[in-house]
């Protein structure tokens, strides 16, 4: 594992010169997102917009539905259970290729909060309960992603280890526990992995919400030498002056936020030093240089090869290689806890009929939800997997529904409905304005529909 190297003096001098060319308003504009997933560009200094994408078990991209599929990695908990840093670094390189395929510059992962209880609502996207294991596997993940010229994001800094009241909870923790447990994985990701981005969490620690916390400066920036960007979790920035005076660098999502004109006024009135704004802009330009978003500067690593086109899955041999790597990772992270009477593996020549019982056997449940969720191109349910393995051997596989465990109604699948305009399997989705005029019409192949933040369908006005 080779951590990313720091910027050289020539690049630093150029960044200083670019910052000096911007007036206060343009500098402050750069420090809040342009949308839910993009930064502002600034042609005057050769800066293009950068795209951030959810992770960490895949790269979602800006389109979050069945039209933009993604490689679906095993749960990060399974990745840590492999205890295999080289394998995880390879998976990081795959994520970099996926990010570039979807035109993303920053991957919002890995999550290195600790699994304090099995009831934690997002622990499936964390690596483990052990700070050493989380740090080493997380650093390998970061190194792999950034080897492909894509920024990895260490999140959620720090002590965001419970979903309950995460927006308001104030975690009280002594110095030794904080450093030896909760900060330890982040330190490894910064020092060993060379992470380019760190995400400040929603929660507070010892009286300060994390977007205003002194922990962003020390130990993160000063003691550990972090020279990248500290981005807020989405809508986690609750103040203008306090957050700007802290070591927070970038507010998401945009374009609205507590900085903007309020921060310009705070600087002009002397409540926030302009040097603090300059440091934030300098870090953002440094990140842009690393991912290839700053004109005239070679990225820190070349973009990996990827198929042409936005969001399309790898084809042919590339798809086979990706599937093989994901399958190997899933197997490496699995543990057979007990094998009574050497029942497994089943001897196929002694089988005639196999019963598979339960509704979940027919469902390919490969991931959790929320920020970690992606739309895989292809999944295999336990039932389909057993049939594929056993039926060619002459074994009959019988499925029984068993007890119904789902409350409510399942969404219709594409095979159950047809588009009234084209007759294809699927549905016709129309977006109407307040007067019933069609703003947009599109064919969809899923009954599960959703939109995030300002991802309003084309032509629809934002409801702000």
What are these regions (language model features)?
Residues 1-464:
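Glycoside hydrolase catalytic-domain context in secreted enzymes
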């Amino acid at each position: 594992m080779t951590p990313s190297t720091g910027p050289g003096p020539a690049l630093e001098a150029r960044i200083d010169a670019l910052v000096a060319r911007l007036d206060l308003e343009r500098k402050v504009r750069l420090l809040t997102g342009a949308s839910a997933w993009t930064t502002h560009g600034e042609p005057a200094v050769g800066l293009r917009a950068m795209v951030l994408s959810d992770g960490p078990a895949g790269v979602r991209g800006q389109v979050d539905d069945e039209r933009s599929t993604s490689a679906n990695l095993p749960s990060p908990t399974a990745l840590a259970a492999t205890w295999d840093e080289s394998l995880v670094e390879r998976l990081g390189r795959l994520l970099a290729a996926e990010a570039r395929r979807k035109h993303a510059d920053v991957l919002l992962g890995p999550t290195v909060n600790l699994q304090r209880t099995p009831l934690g609502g997002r622990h499936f996207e964390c690596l483990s309960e052990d700070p050493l294991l989380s740090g080493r596997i997380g650093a390998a993940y970061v190194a792999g992603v950034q080897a492909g010229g894509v920024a990895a994001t260490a999140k959620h800094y720090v002590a965001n280890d419970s979903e309950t009241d995460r927006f308001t909870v104030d975690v009280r923790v002594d110095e030794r526990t904080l450093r030896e447990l909760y900060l330890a994985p982040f330190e490894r990701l910064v020092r060993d992995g060379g992470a380019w981005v760190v995400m400040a969490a929603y929660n507070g620690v010892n009286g300060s919400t994390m977007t205003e916390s002194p922990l962003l400066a020390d130990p993160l920036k000063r003691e550990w030498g972090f020279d990248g960007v500290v981005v807020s979790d989405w809508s986690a920035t609750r103040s203008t002056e306090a957050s700007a005076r802290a070591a927070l660098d970038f507010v998401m999502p945009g374009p609205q936020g507590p900085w903007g004109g309020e921060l310009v006024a705070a600087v002009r009135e002397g409540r926030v030093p302009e040097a603090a704004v300059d440091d934030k802009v300098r870090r953002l330009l440094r990140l842009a240089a690393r991912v290839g978003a700053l004109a005239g500067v070679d990225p820190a690593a070349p973009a990996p090869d990827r198929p042409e086109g936005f969001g399309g899955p790898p084809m042919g041999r590339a798809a086979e290689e990706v599937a093989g790597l994901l399958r190997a990772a899933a197997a490496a992270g699995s543990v057979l806890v007990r094998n009574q009477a050497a029942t497994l593996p089943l001897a196929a020549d002694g089988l005639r009929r196999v019963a598979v019982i339960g509704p979940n056997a027919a469902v390919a449940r490969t991931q959790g939800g929320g920020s970690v969720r992606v739309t895989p191109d292809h999944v295999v349910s336990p039932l389909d997997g057993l049939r594929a393995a056993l039926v060619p051997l002459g074994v009959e596989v019988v499925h029984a529904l068993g007890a119904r465990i789902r409350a409510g109604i399942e969404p219709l699948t594409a095979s159950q409905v047809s588009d009234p305009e084209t007759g294809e399997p699927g549905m016709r989705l129309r977006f109407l304005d307040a007067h019933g005029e069609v703003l947009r019409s599109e064919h969809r192949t899923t009954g599960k529909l959703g939109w995030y933040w300002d991802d309003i369908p084309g032509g629809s006005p934002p409801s702000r």
